[in-house]
Each structure stands twice: as structure tokens, then as C-alpha cells.
């Protein structure tokens, strides 16, 4: 038997440790999750929207195990770790006789942890401009923001998330080595002084501070992938350009593989702050009644596509198809 010198044996041991560490840092299986927004649950008018939302949720439940589009390489869609719901959960966030009914519809359909609603996977929601003002301004029995705070505590207790902002609203968690940040309405600390638009309803409540502190504490210079989500994107007239730039500067040092939002439609685009070189890949996730995005993150690739109804108005015999197919290579190196 060959005898290795002591130094060589030590070097060999160090190599084994290094390879084990590298292997542990890489995801063993692709990460799958779904994204939707703007469910706008109704209480009195347009209540058929609630039924269309439920059809979409039922599609989420049955889609795992079906095939990815050939354009994105095929293969089977994995079981999602959860569903991201990016604001405008209900349509009337502070309206007598409607807010509580609409919230009940949302809770009954989406549930919380995948066992208590129609949806069979955990949901991670944020609020949008339709979801009502901060709780101290609310006139109804139910406040969406109060409910999000309550649900965040349950998520913490059940280890579905790992960190929550001091005000109880913004939160973050890890799936595999990917870090997720829920910034709710939009990632700023307060409404820009130039806007003056329905301030209580459009107060982001220190979301950007949470994003900054959370990424510094949990991601640092590791280079691991980051996904940031909010209701509004870089096309919203009351989250203004200078605030977009401040957000860009805050996340520039990190490996942000996508920014997810709702509010204004559906699509995939690239955006960067003026004067910058690197683009963010931005996904506008559409309305729940129409469809949802399927996202997969593997060791070196992000791929996503929109699973959408061919005719969103139908309540039976619904046909589904793929749109907005996108993929890119990703790394696990810090952005700068």
C-alpha cells in the first residue's frame, strides 16, 4: 500500500473538506416556486373574479409534475416551496361591508401554510395599494396590514421565514441557498415628498431600510442569489425615479437574480438606474385570475414562464398555455 507523507495526507484531508464545503453550498436540487399578484378579491361586484382566482389556484395545485416548455429545456416542473402573492390581495382595503368579506375570500383560497386553504403550498403575501392604509388609519374591523403582521408571527413560529422587520410587515427567508426579501408596497422608506398622493395608503413604511439591513446581515459578500419582491415596479408614478435609483444603489453589491412585482400588468423586462451598467431582470407577474409565473433556480440557471389561461373569462373548460418564457445563466458571486 502506498504511504503518503504526513504533509500530503493533511493536504488531501483539506482538499476533501474544501470539496465538501463547496458541494454543501450548491443546491442539490432545483428550487421551484410560483408567483402571482393582484388577486383583487371582491365582495359585492365582479365576484366572478373570485371564482377565476380559484381556478388559477387549482391549476397551481396540479401543475407540478407536468413539463416545462421545450424552449426552456423541458423536464418536469418540481413541487413549489411556496407561492409569492405580490399585493392588491383584495380590491377594497377600507370599505364598509366589503373589506372583511374580501379578506376572508383571500384567506380561504390562499390559506397560510398549505394546509388551511384551497392552495396546497405555503403563501408569502405582501400588501399593495388596494389593500388599505396602516392599521391606525383603518375604519373597518379587518386590516390587511394587521393580518400580515399576525401571519408573519405564525410564519416565524413555523420556521417558514427567518426575519421580520421591527414593524412586523417586511420579511425574509431562505430556500436552498437563495435569499428572498418581501418588501410589500415598494422598497422605499417613505413616500417621496414630491408625490403627495393618498399618503397613508402609499406609505412603504421603512421597507428599504429593512432590505438594506437584511441583505447586509444575511447575504453580505457571499454572492448567493437574491430575489426581491414588492407590489410596484419601475413604472409606477408614485414610486419615483430617484427612489428607484436609491433602491438600485442599495442592492447593487448583491447578486440579485430577479426583481418581482405586480400592479401594472404582465411581462419580463430589463431595467437599470441611469448611468449604471448592470441590468436587473424584472418580472411583472400579472393578475391571479389570468395566471401565474413558474420559477426555477438551479445551480447555474434561472428559468421562468407564465402559465396563463387562453381565455381568462371562462369558468369551465379552461385551457392553459405558456407565455413570457425566459432563462439566464446565474452565478454565485457577488455583483461587485
Per-region residue spans from a language model:
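Bacterial N-terminal signal peptides
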Residues: 10-21
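Extended active-site neighborhood of metal-dependent phosphoesterases/phosphodiesterases
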Residues: 93-210, 246-252, 258, 266-306, ...
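Residue-level marker for buried hydrophobic side chains located in beta-strands
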Residues: 33-35, 83-85, 125, 228, ...
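Short acidic, glycine-rich surface-loop motifs adjacent to enzyme active sites
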Residues: 215-236
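Histidine-centered catalytic micro-motifs
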Residues: 229-233, 257-267
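Bacterial N-terminal signal peptides that target proteins for export
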Residues: 2-12
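N-terminal active-site segment of His-dependent metallophosphoesterases
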Residues: 24-98
Amino acid at each position: 500500500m502506498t504511504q503518503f507523507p504526513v504533509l500530503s495526507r493533511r493536504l488531501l484531508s483539506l482538499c476533501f473538506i474544501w470539496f465538501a464545503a463547496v458541494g454543501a453550498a450548491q443546491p442539490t436540487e432545483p428550487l421551484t416556486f410560483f408567483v402571482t399578484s393582484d388577486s383583487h378579491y371582491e365582495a359585492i361586484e365582479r365576484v366572478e373574479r373570485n371564482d377565476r382566482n380559484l381556478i388559477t389556484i387549482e391549476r397551481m395545485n396540479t401543475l407540478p409534475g407536468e413539463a416545462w416548455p421545450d424552449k426552456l429545456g423541458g423536464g418536469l416542473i418540481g413541487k413549489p416551496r411556496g407561492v409569492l402573492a405580490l399585493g392588491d390581495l383584495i380590491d377594497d382595503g377600507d370599505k364598509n361591508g366589503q373589506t372583511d368579506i374580501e379578506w376572508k375570500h383571500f384567506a380561504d383560497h390562499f390559506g397560510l401554510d398549505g394546509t388551511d386553504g384551497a392552495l396546497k403550498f405555503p403563501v408569502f403575501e405582501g400588501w399593495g395599494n388596494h389593500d388599505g392604509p396602516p392599521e391606525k388609519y383603518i375604519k373597518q374591523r379587518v386590516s390587511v396590514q394587521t393580518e400580515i403582521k399576525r401571519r408573519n408571527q405564525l410564519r416565524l413560529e413555523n420556521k417558514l421565514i427567518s426575519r421580520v422587520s421591527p414593524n412586523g410587515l417586511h420579511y425574509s427567508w431562505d430556500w436552498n441557498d437563495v435569499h428572498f426579501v418581501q418588501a410589500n408596497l415598494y422598497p422605499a422608506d417613505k413616500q417621496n415628498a414630491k408625490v403627495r398622493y393618498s399618503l397613508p395608503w402609499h406609505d412603504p413604511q421603512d421597507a428599504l431600510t429593512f432590505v438594506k439591513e437584511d441583505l447586509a446581515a444575511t447575504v453580505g459578500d457571499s454572492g448567493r442569489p437574491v430575489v426581491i419582491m414588492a407590489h410596484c415596479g419601475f413604472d409606477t408614478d408614485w414610486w419615483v425615479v430617484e427612489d428607484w435609483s436609491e433602491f438600485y444603489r442599495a442592492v447593487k453589491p448583491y447578486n440579485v437574480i430577479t426583481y418581482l412585482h405586480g400592479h401594472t400588468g404582465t411581462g419580463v423586462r430589463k431595467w437599470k438606474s441611469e448611468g449604471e451598467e448592470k441590468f436587473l431582470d424584472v418580472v411583472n407577474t400579472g393578475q391571479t385570475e389570468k395566471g401565474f409565473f413558474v420559477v426555477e433556480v438551479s445551480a447555474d440557471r434561472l428559468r421562468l414562464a407564465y402559465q396563463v389561461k387562453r381565455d381568462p373569462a371562462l369558468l369551465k373548460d379552461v385551457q392553459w398555455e405558456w407565455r413570457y418564457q425566459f432563462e439566464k445563466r446565474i452565478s454565485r458571486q457577488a455583483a461587485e
